[in-house]
């Protein structure tokens, strides 16, 4: 069984269903960061912050330091989902196979080693399944596992807000990717 903890709450940069135009940033876009505890591995999903806030959230909400993270998993190639990856150079870096090339190029552009990134199709660990969730980006993925409360899906930005789900509308960036 896999247990998990949220380390921060994200926010969308704009929401057309609240009357906010897609071409005006209202607030910084930040994803939810999640830590999974799977037998011998600690997995950080979508490290959201490029600054020391990443370290503070990890410690305050999960009691962890960068050296404690075995795997960093990125759900899709939007920068708010990998801004903090540089804090985890010793960890294994993974994403879904469909995002691997573009995300690798984005890491290279930040002077990080994009070749280190592994593209996965089915399993991250024997207990954690990689699930394709195309929509927000065509290569978006989530992680599905059995938790204490039943089945859990860490889904990145698959559903931005209830309004996006109800209207079956993608985020403004999605249409070009």
Regions flagged by a language model, labelled:
Residues 1-40:
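Zn-dependent metallo-beta-lactamase
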Residues 1-4, 37-42, 121-131, 147-151:
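Beta-strand-turn-beta hairpins that frame and shape the catalytic cleft
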Residues 33-35, 123, 140-144:
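Short acidic loop-to-beta-strand element that houses the catalytic metal-binding Asp/Glu
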Residues 44-48, 70-80, 94-96, 132-135, ...:
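Active-site neighborhood of phospho(di)ester-bond hydrolases with catalytic His/Asp-centered motifs
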Residues 52, 77-83, 101-102, 138-140, ...:
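Active-site environment of divalent metal-dependent phosphoester hydrolases
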Residues 52-95:
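Active-site metal-binding motif and surrounding structural segment of the metallo-beta-lactamase
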Residues 64, 68, 87, 91-177, ...:
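Metallo-beta-lactamase
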